[in-house]
UniProtKB/Swiss-Prot annotation:
Any GO CC annotation of this UniProt entry: cytoplasm
Complexes and interactors: Homodimer.
EC primary class: ligase
Enzyme Commission number(s): 6.1.1.21
Biological classification of the source: Bacteria, Pseudomonadati, Spirochaetota, Spirochaetia, Leptospirales
Identification of the protein by name: Histidine--tRNA ligase
HAMAP family documented for this protein: His_tRNA_synth (MF_00127)
Pfam families, sorted: HGTP_anticodon (PF03129), tRNA-synt_His (PF13393)
Any one GO BP annotation for this protein: histidyl-tRNA aminoacylation
GO molecular function: ATP binding; histidine-tRNA ligase activity
Source organism of this protein record: Leptospira biflexa serovar Patoc (strain Patoc 1 / ATCC 23582 / Paris)
Disulfide bonds: none
Gene (UniProt): hisS
Length: 437
């Protein structure tokens, strides 16, 4: 009976990263890290597996109930593969709360898991830049986070009109629903979930869900629509909104003018965000391209996460940017560069007697931080050149019979197809000069 072979397909909703894919991923990570480090943020990481209770506390019903990967470990503990990073960073900060200098500025790019239907911009495993600041209560923290979030896209070459930022405040919706519409806390919670998915359902479905949730108010839909269309200046006409909340929103938008982003940052009370831990300002960044018109990433202020672990509260604010949505954005706006191979110099082996000297040449190149691969098998020149071309090598460093006689090397530039005969030191200098351009 023929042995059944294992499938070569990867698990649904995940990706295999071949070398060319890793070049793209490393590029995305490198640009993001450069930007956040320029703001003074430090990198951290945490475990992929956490206690399930960590996510039950504040992550949100849909993720914990339907999307989380959880299991019972061999010690009979309920654990989960992390679906997000904010609960982990809050736990880590709380663990060393008295030792850490404030404000705390941290970032990480973890891989996260959610069991959901894969689609455009959505996979079961993805990597996400998480940026968090702890210990600053003033709206200057919002200004820094918003500026940083925009600077990441600018660093990839995104023009200002390629994305927009929408901002609201978590208290707005709560105050409107509880004090304006006079609904119960449970009804308010259900309405917020409906609004969070409003753009993903039809208008009829939206009306039906609101009517079912608030059956005793026939004008609930029109009142909610009035709220959703409010501007900063018309918010005082919405019932239930407190003066303190109004002042905070107006103050933030006055401050936004000072950082030169008022043309792309807009007020939008429909911004909800699905996590239960947000308590203050919340924001979403949207792609404006018709080919990729969707939310790219978002974040907000959370004031009660540290208190889950400690008697001391510490305010936090942050955002998360996924690699899949970022790549889709860069593709839609034609912002991805052509990635050349990391490989630089290939040294063919034409005769076994040359191997030791070729090996020594490669060592000298590597000392200069120039990657070099030495052929280990003596083969026909055409076959070795074909291999080097497929691998994307920039230069071929060749030592045939003529070069051995004259103690020289032939350096072939695979980009221009030009070749030169030098001493090895001259060839090394030529490569260094070209790499520095």
């Amino acid at each position: 009976m023929k042995e059944q072979k294992l499938t070569t397909e990867n698990y649904k909703g995940t990706r295999d990263f071949y070398p060319e894919d890793m070049r793209l991923r490393n590029y995305l990570f490198s640009v993001m890290k450069d930007v956040v480090r320029s703001y003074g943020y430090e990198e951290y990481d945490g475990p992929m597996v956490e206690s399930l209770d960590l996510y039950r506390a504040k992550t949100g019903e849909e993720i914990v109930g339907k999307q989380i990967y959880n299991f019972i470990d061999k010690g009979d503990r309920e654990v989960a593969i992390r679906p997000e990073m904010t609960p982990t960073v809050a736990r880590m900060v709380a663990k060393k709360l008295r030792e850490l200098p404030r404000p705390i500025r941290w970032f990480s790019i973890p891989n996260l898991w959610r069991y959901e239907q894969p689609g455009h911009g959505r996979l079961r495993e993805h990597w996400q830049l998480n940026v968090d600041m702890f210990g600053v209560t003033s709206s200057r923290a919002e200004l820094e986070i918003l500026s940083l979030a925009c600077d990441i896209l600018f660093a990839f070459g995104a023009p200002k009109n390629s994305f927009k930022v929408t901002i609201s405040h978590r208290s707005l919706l709560d105050e409107f629903l509880l004090d304006g519409l006079k609904v119960s806390p449970n009804q308010a919670h259900e309405v917020s979930k409906i609004l969070d998915k409003k753009n993903k359902i039809t208008q009829d479905e939206y009306v039906a869900l609101v009517t079912k949730t608030i059956p005793n108010d026939s004008s609930a839909v029109s009142k909610i629509d009035l709220f959703l269309n409010a501007t900063v200046n018309s918010l005082n006409q919405i019932p239930g909104i407190k003066e303190e909340t109004l002042a905070a929103i107006k103050g933030l938008f006055e401050d936004i003018k000072t950082i030169g982003l008022s043309d792309i940052i807009h007020f939008d009370p429909s911004v909800v965000r699905g996590f239960d831990y947000y308590t203050g300002f919340i924001f979403e960044i949207f792609d404006t391209s018709p080919q990729n018109k969707r939310s790219l990433y978002g974040g907000g202020r959370y004031d009660n996460l540290i208190g889950l672990f400690s008697n001391e509260e510490l305010t936090g604010i942050g955002f998360g940017l996924g690699d899949v949505t970022l790549q889709n954005f860069l593709t839609a706006h034609n912002l991805l560069p052509n990635f050349a191979s990391d490989t630089t110099v290939f040294i063919p082996l034409l005769d076994d007697s040359s191997f030791a000297e070729n090996h020594n040449f490669a060592k000298e190149l590597r000392k200069e931080k120039i990657s070099a691969e030495v052929s280990l098998v003596s083969q026909k020149m055409g076959k070795q050149l074909s291999y080097a071309e497929k691998k994307g090598y920039r230069w071929i460093l060749l030592r045939g019979e003529d070069e051995i006689k004259t103690n020289t090397v032939t350096l072939k530039d695979m980009a221009s197809r030009n070749q030169f005969t030098f001493s090895f030191s001259e060839a090394l200098q030529k490569i260094k000069e070209e790499l520095s351009k």
